[in-house]
Protein backbone atom coordinates (compact mmCIF):
# COMPACT_ATOMS: atom_id res chain seq x y z
CA UNK A 1 0.00 0.00 0.00
CA UNK A 2 1.43 3.37 -1.00
CA UNK A 3 1.85 5.97 1.71
CA UNK A 4 -0.86 8.62 1.57
CA UNK A 5 -0.15 12.24 2.35
CA UNK A 6 -2.68 14.69 3.73
CA UNK A 7 -4.39 16.63 0.97
CA UNK A 8 -7.64 18.30 0.07
CA UNK A 9 -9.68 16.37 -2.44
CA UNK A 10 -12.68 17.41 -4.52
CA UNK A 11 -15.95 15.57 -4.39
CA UNK A 12 -17.25 13.80 -7.47
CA UNK A 13 -20.06 11.36 -8.24
CA UNK A 14 -20.07 8.54 -5.73
CA UNK A 15 -17.26 9.95 -3.60
CA UNK A 16 -16.84 12.29 -0.66
CA UNK A 17 -14.57 15.29 -0.19
CA UNK A 18 -12.49 14.05 2.71
CA UNK A 19 -8.92 14.71 3.74
CA UNK A 20 -7.06 11.39 3.59
CA UNK A 21 -4.12 10.66 5.84
CA UNK A 22 -1.81 7.72 6.35
CA UNK A 23 -2.18 5.75 9.59
CA UNK A 24 -0.72 7.51 12.60
CA UNK A 25 0.12 10.83 10.93
CA UNK A 26 -2.88 12.81 12.15
CA UNK A 27 -2.07 13.20 15.82
CA UNK A 28 -0.26 16.52 16.04
CA UNK A 29 -2.74 18.91 14.49
CA UNK A 30 -4.40 21.93 16.03
CA UNK A 31 -7.63 19.94 15.85
CA UNK A 32 -6.14 17.28 18.11
CA UNK A 33 -5.42 20.02 20.66
CA UNK A 34 -9.07 21.13 20.54
CA UNK A 35 -10.16 17.53 21.10
CA UNK A 36 -8.14 17.23 24.29
CA UNK A 37 -9.75 20.18 26.08
CA UNK A 38 -11.43 19.01 29.28
CA UNK A 39 -14.94 19.75 30.44
CA UNK A 40 -16.69 18.87 27.17
CA UNK A 41 -18.01 15.68 25.64
CA UNK A 42 -16.50 14.61 22.33
CA UNK A 43 -19.57 15.67 20.33
CA UNK A 44 -19.34 19.27 21.56
CA UNK A 45 -15.61 19.35 20.81
CA UNK A 46 -16.16 18.09 17.28
CA UNK A 47 -18.95 20.62 16.70
CA UNK A 48 -16.65 23.40 17.91
CA UNK A 49 -13.83 22.19 15.65
CA UNK A 50 -16.24 21.58 12.71
CA UNK A 51 -14.23 18.46 11.95
CA UNK A 52 -14.05 14.76 12.80
CA UNK A 53 -11.39 12.12 12.16
CA UNK A 54 -12.63 8.73 10.97
CA UNK A 55 -10.68 5.51 10.64
CA UNK A 56 -11.60 3.37 7.63
CA UNK A 57 -10.16 0.43 5.65
CA UNK A 58 -9.65 0.28 1.89
CA UNK A 59 -12.29 -2.40 1.40
CA UNK A 60 -14.79 -1.42 -1.33
CA UNK A 61 -17.73 -1.18 -1.42
CA UNK A 62 -17.88 -0.86 2.40
CA UNK A 63 -15.29 1.93 2.37
CA UNK A 64 -12.27 2.75 0.28
CA UNK A 65 -10.43 5.04 -2.08
CA UNK A 66 -11.16 5.99 -5.66
CA UNK A 67 -8.19 6.09 -8.08
CA UNK A 68 -7.96 9.87 -7.57
CA UNK A 69 -7.65 9.48 -3.80
CA UNK A 70 -11.20 10.52 -2.89
CA UNK A 71 -12.91 8.46 -0.21
CA UNK A 72 -15.91 6.37 -1.19
CA UNK A 73 -18.03 3.57 0.17
CA UNK A 74 -21.26 2.94 2.05
CA UNK A 75 -20.01 3.64 5.58
CA UNK A 76 -18.28 7.00 4.87
CA UNK A 77 -21.28 8.15 2.82
CA UNK A 78 -23.62 7.43 5.74
CA UNK A 79 -21.18 9.14 8.12
CA UNK A 80 -20.95 12.24 5.92
CA UNK A 81 -24.75 12.61 5.92
CA UNK A 82 -24.98 12.21 9.69
CA UNK A 83 -22.08 14.54 10.49
CA UNK A 84 -23.60 17.31 8.38
CA UNK A 85 -26.83 16.98 10.38
CA UNK A 86 -24.81 17.26 13.59
CA UNK A 87 -23.06 20.44 12.43
CA UNK A 88 -19.71 18.79 11.67
CA UNK A 89 -19.01 19.38 7.97
CA UNK A 90 -15.30 18.52 7.92
CA UNK A 91 -14.21 14.88 7.79
CA UNK A 92 -10.62 13.67 7.81
CA UNK A 93 -10.34 10.06 6.67
CA UNK A 94 -7.42 8.02 8.00
CA UNK A 95 -6.68 4.80 6.16
CA UNK A 96 -6.06 1.64 8.23
CA UNK A 97 -6.44 -2.13 8.03
CA UNK A 98 -9.33 -3.85 9.81
CA UNK A 99 -6.98 -5.02 12.53
CA UNK A 100 -5.85 -1.45 13.22
CA UNK A 101 -9.30 0.14 13.44
CA UNK A 102 -10.11 -0.45 17.11
CA UNK A 103 -6.55 -0.03 18.49
CA UNK A 104 -6.14 3.18 16.49
CA UNK A 105 -9.40 4.61 17.82
CA UNK A 106 -8.52 3.68 21.41
CA UNK A 107 -5.14 5.38 20.91
CA UNK A 108 -6.96 8.56 19.71
CA UNK A 109 -5.62 8.37 16.16
CA UNK A 110 -9.21 8.90 15.03
CA UNK A 111 -12.49 9.74 16.75
CA UNK A 112 -14.52 6.75 15.62
CA UNK A 113 -14.50 3.94 13.09
CA UNK A 114 -16.54 4.54 9.94
CA UNK A 115 -16.55 1.09 8.39
CA UNK A 116 -18.53 -2.13 8.16
CA UNK A 117 -16.82 -3.55 11.25
CA UNK A 118 -18.25 -6.93 12.21
CA UNK A 119 -20.04 -6.90 15.57
CA UNK A 120 -18.65 -9.67 17.81
CA UNK A 121 -18.69 -10.44 21.52
CA UNK A 122 -14.97 -9.73 21.92
CA UNK A 123 -15.20 -6.37 20.17
CA UNK A 124 -18.29 -5.37 22.14
CA UNK A 125 -16.19 -5.53 25.31
CA UNK A 126 -13.86 -2.89 23.84
CA UNK A 127 -16.13 -0.51 21.92
CA UNK A 128 -19.73 0.61 21.52
CA UNK A 129 -21.23 -0.37 18.17
CA UNK A 130 -23.82 1.66 16.32
CA UNK A 131 -26.83 -0.03 14.75
CA UNK A 132 -25.87 -2.38 11.90
CA UNK A 133 -25.39 -0.81 8.49
CA UNK A 134 -24.61 -4.12 6.80
CA UNK A 135 -26.03 -7.56 7.47
CA UNK A 136 -24.18 -10.09 5.39
CA UNK A 137 -22.40 -13.44 5.44
CA UNK A 138 -19.28 -14.57 3.64
CA UNK A 139 -18.49 -16.35 0.40
CA UNK A 140 -16.00 -19.13 -0.10
CA UNK A 141 -14.39 -18.27 -3.43
CA UNK A 142 -12.24 -20.36 -5.77
CA UNK A 143 -11.12 -20.30 -9.38
CA UNK A 144 -13.50 -22.22 -11.62
CA UNK A 145 -10.81 -24.78 -12.49
CA UNK A 146 -9.99 -25.68 -8.88
CA UNK A 147 -9.62 -29.43 -8.24
CA UNK A 148 -12.21 -31.35 -6.24
CA UNK A 149 -15.64 -30.38 -4.93
CA UNK A 150 -16.41 -26.85 -3.80
CA UNK A 151 -16.44 -26.57 0.02
CA UNK A 152 -19.78 -25.69 1.58
CA UNK A 153 -18.45 -25.09 5.10
CA UNK A 154 -15.41 -23.43 6.66
CA UNK A 155 -14.72 -26.71 8.46
CA UNK A 156 -14.20 -28.38 5.08
CA UNK A 157 -11.36 -25.94 4.39
CA UNK A 158 -9.73 -27.16 7.59
CA UNK A 159 -10.17 -30.85 6.80
CA UNK A 160 -8.73 -30.41 3.30
CA UNK A 161 -5.55 -28.74 4.54
CA UNK A 162 -6.08 -25.85 2.13
CA UNK A 163 -4.35 -22.47 2.18
CA UNK A 164 -7.11 -19.88 2.66
CA UNK A 165 -7.15 -16.11 2.20
CA UNK A 166 -9.10 -13.68 4.41
CA UNK A 167 -9.23 -9.93 5.20
CA UNK A 168 -6.40 -8.91 7.54
CA UNK A 169 -7.48 -8.52 11.15
CA UNK A 170 -11.12 -9.20 10.32
CA UNK A 171 -13.70 -11.47 11.91
CA UNK A 172 -13.18 -13.95 9.06
CA UNK A 173 -9.78 -14.93 10.44
CA UNK A 174 -11.33 -15.78 13.82
CA UNK A 175 -14.12 -17.70 12.10
CA UNK A 176 -11.57 -19.76 10.15
CA UNK A 177 -9.60 -20.49 13.30
CA UNK A 178 -12.79 -21.50 15.12
CA UNK A 179 -13.60 -23.86 12.23
CA UNK A 180 -10.23 -25.57 12.67
CA UNK A 181 -8.14 -23.94 9.95
CA UNK A 182 -4.58 -23.62 11.35
CA UNK A 183 -3.12 -20.13 11.51
CA UNK A 184 -0.22 -21.17 9.26
CA UNK A 185 -2.76 -22.02 6.55
CA UNK A 186 -4.38 -18.57 6.64
CA UNK A 187 -3.06 -15.74 4.48
CA UNK A 188 -4.30 -12.26 5.40
CA UNK A 189 -4.82 -9.47 2.86
CA UNK A 190 -5.50 -5.75 3.21
CA UNK A 191 -8.36 -5.83 0.69
CA UNK A 192 -10.41 -8.15 -1.51
CA UNK A 193 -8.58 -7.34 -4.80
CA UNK A 194 -5.28 -8.43 -3.20
CA UNK A 195 -6.92 -11.66 -2.09
CA UNK A 196 -8.22 -12.32 -5.60
CA UNK A 197 -4.74 -11.63 -7.03
CA UNK A 198 -3.34 -14.28 -4.66
CA UNK A 199 -6.02 -16.71 -5.82
CA UNK A 200 -5.11 -16.07 -9.46
CA UNK A 201 -1.41 -16.54 -8.67
CA UNK A 202 -2.20 -19.87 -6.91
CA UNK A 203 -0.77 -18.60 -3.62
CA UNK A 204 -4.03 -19.56 -1.92
CA UNK A 205 -6.48 -22.35 -2.72
CA UNK A 206 -9.63 -20.57 -1.55
CA UNK A 207 -10.63 -17.11 -0.40
CA UNK A 208 -13.18 -16.03 2.19
CA UNK A 209 -14.73 -12.61 1.58
CA UNK A 210 -18.01 -10.73 1.60
CA UNK A 211 -20.59 -11.16 -1.19
CA UNK A 212 -20.53 -7.40 -1.75
CA UNK A 213 -16.75 -7.46 -2.18
CA UNK A 214 -17.00 -10.28 -4.71
CA UNK A 215 -19.71 -8.46 -6.67
CA UNK A 216 -17.52 -5.35 -6.80
CA UNK A 217 -14.59 -7.35 -8.19
CA UNK A 218 -16.71 -9.15 -10.78
CA UNK A 219 -17.94 -5.77 -12.04
CA UNK A 220 -14.38 -4.55 -12.53
CA UNK A 221 -12.56 -7.68 -13.70
CA UNK A 222 -13.28 -10.68 -15.92
CA UNK A 223 -12.60 -13.64 -13.64
CA UNK A 224 -14.19 -17.09 -13.75
CA UNK A 225 -15.00 -17.85 -10.11
CA UNK A 226 -16.92 -20.53 -8.26
CA UNK A 227 -18.68 -19.26 -5.16
CA UNK A 228 -20.31 -20.84 -2.12
CA UNK A 229 -23.00 -18.68 -0.50
CA UNK A 230 -24.35 -18.99 2.07
CA UNK A 231 -21.63 -20.82 3.97
CA UNK A 232 -23.36 -23.37 6.19
CA UNK A 233 -21.26 -22.85 9.33
CA UNK A 234 -20.76 -19.09 8.90
CA UNK A 235 -24.16 -17.38 9.22
CA UNK A 236 -24.64 -13.70 8.32
CA UNK A 237 -23.25 -11.12 10.73
CA UNK A 238 -24.14 -7.52 11.43
CA UNK A 239 -21.51 -4.85 10.84
CA UNK A 240 -21.46 -1.25 12.03
CA UNK A 241 -19.46 1.82 12.90
CA UNK A 242 -17.73 1.75 16.30
CA UNK A 243 -17.25 4.31 19.07
CA UNK A 244 -15.20 4.51 22.25
CA UNK A 245 -17.07 3.53 25.41
CA UNK A 246 -16.27 6.92 26.96
CA UNK A 247 -17.99 8.85 24.12
CA UNK A 248 -21.72 8.17 24.71
CA UNK A 249 -22.70 11.66 23.51
CA UNK A 250 -21.28 11.10 20.02
CA UNK A 251 -22.62 7.55 19.90
CA UNK A 252 -26.16 8.57 20.90
CA UNK A 253 -26.27 11.49 18.46
CA UNK A 254 -24.93 9.34 15.61
CA UNK A 255 -27.33 6.45 16.23
CA UNK A 256 -30.25 8.83 16.66
CA UNK A 257 -29.66 10.40 13.24
CA UNK A 258 -29.07 7.02 11.62
CA UNK A 259 -32.38 5.72 12.93
CA UNK A 260 -34.12 8.71 11.34
CA UNK A 261 -32.38 7.84 8.04
CA UNK A 262 -33.48 4.22 8.42
CA UNK A 263 -37.10 5.22 9.05
CA UNK A 264 -37.17 7.61 6.08
CA UNK A 265 -35.66 5.12 3.63
CA UNK A 266 -32.52 7.22 3.11
CA UNK A 267 -30.27 4.59 4.69
CA UNK A 268 -31.56 1.80 2.44
CA UNK A 269 -31.15 4.08 -0.61
CA UNK A 270 -27.49 4.76 0.21
CA UNK A 271 -26.80 1.07 0.71
CA UNK A 272 -28.50 0.17 -2.59
CA UNK A 273 -26.35 2.73 -4.40
CA UNK A 274 -23.32 0.67 -3.33
CA UNK A 275 -24.86 -2.66 -4.35
CA UNK A 276 -26.25 -3.81 -0.99
CA UNK A 277 -29.62 -5.54 -0.83
CA UNK A 278 -30.89 -5.48 2.74
CA UNK A 279 -34.07 -4.88 4.71
CA UNK A 280 -35.12 -2.58 7.53
CA UNK A 281 -35.81 -5.70 9.61
CA UNK A 282 -32.18 -6.84 9.26
CA UNK A 283 -30.83 -3.38 10.01
CA UNK A 284 -33.07 -3.21 13.08
CA UNK A 285 -31.46 -6.29 14.67
CA UNK A 286 -30.56 -5.32 18.26
CA UNK A 287 -26.84 -4.77 18.76
CA UNK A 288 -27.04 -6.70 22.06
CA UNK A 289 -28.12 -9.77 20.10
CA UNK A 290 -25.21 -9.39 17.67
CA UNK A 291 -22.78 -8.84 20.54
CA UNK A 292 -23.59 -12.31 21.85
CA UNK A 293 -21.84 -13.88 18.86
CA UNK A 294 -18.36 -15.20 19.63
CA UNK A 295 -16.71 -14.64 16.21
Set out the residue ranges of the language-model regions.
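N-terminal secretory signal peptides and thylakoid transit peptides that target proteins
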Residues: 1-20
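Extracytoplasmic small-molecule ligand-binding "clamshell" domains
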Residues: 34-116, 125
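A ligand-binding cleft/hinge motif common to bilobed small-molecule-binding domains
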Residues: 100, 116-125, 177, 205-235
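Flexible hinge/capping segments at coil-to-helix
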Residues: 143-163
